[in-house]
Amino acid sequence: MIGKLKGTIDEIGEDHVVLDVHGVGYVAHCSARTLAKLGRAGEAAVLFIETYVREDQLKLFGFLSALEREWFRLLQSVQGVGSKVALAVLSTLTPGELANAIALQDKTSISRAPGVGPKVAVRIVTELKNKAPAFVGEMAPSIGLKQELGEGVAAAPVSDAVSALTNLGYSRDQAANAVAAALKNGGEGADSARLIRLGLKELSR
């Protein structure tokens, strides 16, 4: 089982990278985000590896962080999500953005990934909503947001507020954190317009 590879980039393809490790070229399939962050041919690179062994093939998937690899594994625990769809989701959303989308029940953001229709997006949100908080690191903001949401807070106004703040130029994590703070500071039960105002107030501090 291969867990990690450190070597020199030989070539970067549309959906994979060939990593030269002591003269052996390993083909690792990666998300578009990972490929975009890799250096050029001839430069050093380190990839966390997920190894798939089938009767007729051995396939490697490469990630820049262990967290991204864990998300790849977790996504495939959802019915109807295979390696191709999991990589498509990770090509569209960072681990932090994906965690926020699940916490916010934001199916629209997840369905932006190629090959992810509304039904699959619903399953991802539904099946992972209780598993996602087990992760740490980049996902910490979304965990806090999920705790602020609780069971009695309507998801739609929260999702709309985060989307609006994102459209104003803030990153998704900034927007999610601002809305979480707004909920904590008296915004529970507020409509999207009020959450946007409170969120902007938090961002201006």
From Swiss-Prot:
Region annotated Domain III, chain positions: 153-205
Region (Domain I): 1-64
UniProt GO BP: DNA recombination; DNA repair
The UniProt record lists the keyword DNA damage: yes
Annotated stretches, region: Flexible linker: 144-153
Keywords of this entry: Cytoplasm, DNA damage, DNA recombination, DNA repair, DNA-binding
GO molecular function: ATP binding; four-way junction DNA binding; four-way junction helicase activity
Subcellular location: Cytoplasm
Residues covered by region (Domain II): 65-143
Annotated InterPro entries: DNA_helicase_Holl-junc_RuvA_I, NA-bd_OB-fold, RuvA, RuvA_2-like, RuvA_C, RuvA_C_sf
Domain of life: Bacteria
GO cellular component: cytoplasm; Holliday junction helicase complex; Holliday junction resolvase complex
Family named by the database record: Belongs to the RuvA family.
Function: The RuvA-RuvB-RuvC complex processes Holliday junction (HJ) DNA during genetic recombination and DNA repair, while the RuvA-RuvB complex plays an important role in the rescue of blocked DNA replication forks via replication fork reversal (RFR). RuvA specifically binds to HJ cruciform DNA, conferring on it an open structure. The RuvB hexamer acts as an ATP-dependent pump, pulling dsDNA into and through the RuvAB complex. HJ branch migration allows RuvC to scan DNA until it finds its consensus sequence, where it cleaves and resolves the cruciform DNA.
Subunit structure: Homotetramer. Forms an RuvA(8)-RuvB(12)-Holliday junction (HJ) complex. HJ DNA is sandwiched between 2 RuvA tetramers; dsDNA enters through RuvA and exits via RuvB. An RuvB hexamer assembles on each DNA strand where it exits the tetramer. Each RuvB hexamer is contacted by two RuvA subunits (via domain III) on 2 adjacent RuvB subunits; this complex drives branch migration. In the full resolvosome a probable DNA-RuvA(4)-RuvB(12)-RuvC(2) complex forms which resolves the HJ.
Record remark: domains: Has three domains with a flexible linker between the domains II and III and assumes an 'L' shape. Domain III is highly mobile and contacts RuvB.
Name of the protein this chain belongs to: Holliday junction branch migration complex subunit RuvA
Species in which this protein is naturally found: Sinorhizobium medicae (strain WSM419)
